[in-house]
Amino acid sequence: MPIDNLPPLREVINAYGLQANKSLGQNFLFDLNLTSKIARQAGNIEGKPVIEIGPGPGGLTRALLAKGAIVTVIERDKRCLPALLEIEKHYPKKLNLIFDDALKQDLSKLSETYPEKPRIIANLPYNIGTQLLLNWLLTTSWPPFYESMTLMFQREVAKRITATPQSPHYSRLSVLAGWRTIAKIAFDVPPQAFIPAPKVTSSVINIIPRPQPLACSVQKLSLVTKVAFGEKRKMLRQSLKTIGGKELLEKAGIDETRRAETLLIPEFITLANLMT
């Protein structure tokens, strides 16, 4: 069942010659039922501001607009302009187009133009998805500029974002995400849902900011997690050697023979807060 009166995405992609650009990390979703499922994950978005990164030909964009959202898309590939302009005509005053590199955009300033905090909903380009997420997790002010995030990543990345201590995917990204947010995998998306089909399964995750995360310096927690997981197979007394090693661990009351993958998030916070 169509979500609007616009052409099917396969026709749009063919009509405008939109072959996915590997260097931009593009994989286009073409199943509008699936894009609608992603839009539903964000809850009631009718009349709500939404920011989408990397819309491509606009499959998810159409699903968000069909749900009544006020959407701003950020796209650096100008080949997508004609397809997005067609959507803009269909949804007058509901779609704002920004053609730029998402890594160069200050979304916190953009959000100040909205009457309420936006939701970020996106099938993120694979090559910049993790960096974008880190930028949004490590904002200077908290609570952040966004209400929630519903994002698609490669499944391996999604597992690292949502992993818990002692699990094989527990990583620096798990700690930084778990410190300030609650992140959960909603569902998986098979490779055949994309054009072109990637070699891996993708996952949609929901991320909700914690209103009052444990107090900690962003810079210090970034550093302690970077060095700890940089040599995660080593004991902490060795992996943390450059930032205090045994002395820091003793102050924190943490066994120096443990490894990064065993530490709880509050223990990483303690280490960061004790750094000089």
From Swiss-Prot:
Its EC number is 2.1.1.182. It comes from the Bacteria. GO terms for cellular component: cytosol. S-adenosyl-L-methionine binds at residues 27, 29, 54, 75, 101, 123. It is found in: Cytoplasm. Signal peptide: none annotated. It is an enzyme of class 2 (transferase). Transmembrane segments: none annotated. It catalyses: adenosine(1518)/adenosine(1519) in 16S rRNA + 4 S-adenosyl-L-methionine = N(6)-dimethyladenosine(1518)/N(6)-dimethyladenosine(1519) in 16S rRNA + 4 S-adenosyl-L-homocysteine + 4 H(+). GO terms for molecular function: 16S rRNA (adenine(1518)-N(6)/adenine(1519)-N(6))-dimethyltransferase activity; RNA binding. Belongs to the class I-like SAM-binding methyltransferase superfamily. rRNA adenine N(6)-methyltransferase family. RsmA subfamily. HAMAP family: 16SrRNA_methyltr_A. This is Ribosomal RNA small subunit methyltransferase A. It comes from Bartonella bacilliformis (strain ATCC 35685 / KC583 / Herrer 020/F12,63).
